[in-house]
Each structure stands twice: as structure tokens, then as C-alpha cells.
Amino acid sequence: MGSMKSIKIRNRWTGSVVFEYTKEGNTITETVLGAIRRGADLHGADLCGADLSGADLRGADLHGANLRNADLSGADLRSADLRSANLYGANLCDANLRDANLRDADLRGANLCGANLCGADLYGADLCDANLCDANLRDADLRGANLRG
């Protein structure tokens, strides 16, 4: 039998615990999915460097979350709220961001290669030096977005 492992998700601004999950062999992915299933408020959650590759995050409220350098490759983020999220250097390769709200998100240096951004709201997002190779941007709102680099 493995040992019980507790993982806490903290607010990036206040440091307060917004969700805690304990189970045998726990991972950050299981903790985030548990938080979403239980309707926890992940607004401003600090998930810096988290491995959420392949996770089902459809409709998740990650408004203002710190996902800097997180691995979201292949994740399902359809209709997720990522307004003002810090996704600097995040790996979103082959992620499904269809109809996601990425208004004012920091996507500098993010890898969006092959990502589905169809219908995504990228108004005011910073995509400087982001890799958009083979990304689907059909019907995406790029007004005011920074696409330099």
C-alpha cells in the first residue's frame, strides 16, 4: 500500500488554500480534476509548472490562474475561462481550446503548436514569441492581441 499524499492548491495572490485533496498516490492532475468536480473556486489558483497533460478541463474556471510553464499538452480546455491567466511558457501543444476565453491572457513563449483555438476569445492576449505552428485560429477573436515575435 502506498502512502497518502495531500496536495494543496493555493491562490496566487493571497497564498490561501483554495482546495486540498488527499489520496493514495495523489497527483496534481487528480487534485485539479477533484477541485473541478467539487465546484471549487480556482480563480487565481497557483498551478505554476503543473503537469495537466491530457486532462479534461472542459468549462473549468481558471480565470487569473498562474499556469506559467505548465504542461497542458493534449488537454481539453473547451469553453474554459482562462481570462487574465498567466500561461507564460506553457505547453499547449495539441490542446483543445475551442471557444475558450483567453482575454488578456499572458501566452508569451507558449507552445500552441497544433492547438485548436477555433472560436477562442484572445482579445488583448499577449502571444509574443508563442509558437502557433499548425494552430487552428478560425473564428478566433484576435483584436488587440500582441502577435510579435
Residue ranges of model-derived segments:
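Extended, small-residue-rich solenoid/repeat segments and analogous flexible loops
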Residues: 1-118, 123, 128, 133, ...
